[in-house]
Amino acid sequence: KRCIIDQAPAGYTEHVRDPKPFITAEGKIRFVLGAQRENLTGTCLVYEMDDLNSTPRLLGELAVQDFDNSHVFMWECPDLFQLGGKGVFIWSPQGKLREATQFQNNYHATYALGKLDGNVLNAKHIEELDYGFDFYAPQTVQNSDRILFGWVGLPDLTYPTDKYKWHS
């Protein structure tokens, strides 16, 4: 075991979390991380490595076009992949303001679908993955199929079953 990133890059707080690795078409190891800028807004950092023994290179932030990042302080559990020829980004934007028909909960599981060009996702569609109250922090794994899983139950909430020491 070794630490591959021992501090946040310049311009970011130490609130960096949830690395999600994947292999690029060129055979590079790339990973995305949720991060917080020094101005306390959330983002996603993209790193790349040639192999497991190399030092990660910061490629920059992932830009999701047309996503209102106002008041968002952290992008938790980022996941970036291609599906059916489209770029897909799944994340949980903490602090997202409520909108008329979506983002009504305290915590959200969100996806953006579009064309991925370098570190820019030209999103054609941005929406919550689930409009219920208890689905959060989704991630995917892939073998022959891509499987999505996430939390059932949210932090910082009181549930009626808490008195029985059962939650989610």
Where are the language model's segments positioned?
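Carbohydrate-active catalytic/glycan-binding domains of CAZyme proteins
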Residues: 1-168
